Amino acid sequence: MVRAGTATVFPQAVSLAATFDEDFLEEVADAISTEGRAKFNAQQKYEDFDIYKGLTFWSPNVNIFRDPRWGRGHETFGEDPYLTSTLGVRFVEG
């Protein structure tokens, strides 16, 4: 979404999980989806289909982060299965 103009940037998933705030995470996901719909509607209205104008969302990875050698741990909600499942559900609901 960034190449298609301005977009809101939120912290990595592991940082959001560190808040332990399920309601906040749902609000973040809602903001992301609302902004995405707005960009899509604007593209359709103005027929702006140039290269790099498609919508790409980098959502959290719900794998459990167990091995620190895995280089994508920052994309997860961490190593707690309960927290990861709870936050994953709330992100989808948002």
Predicted feature residues:
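Glycoside hydrolase catalytic-domain context in secreted enzymes
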Residues: 1-94
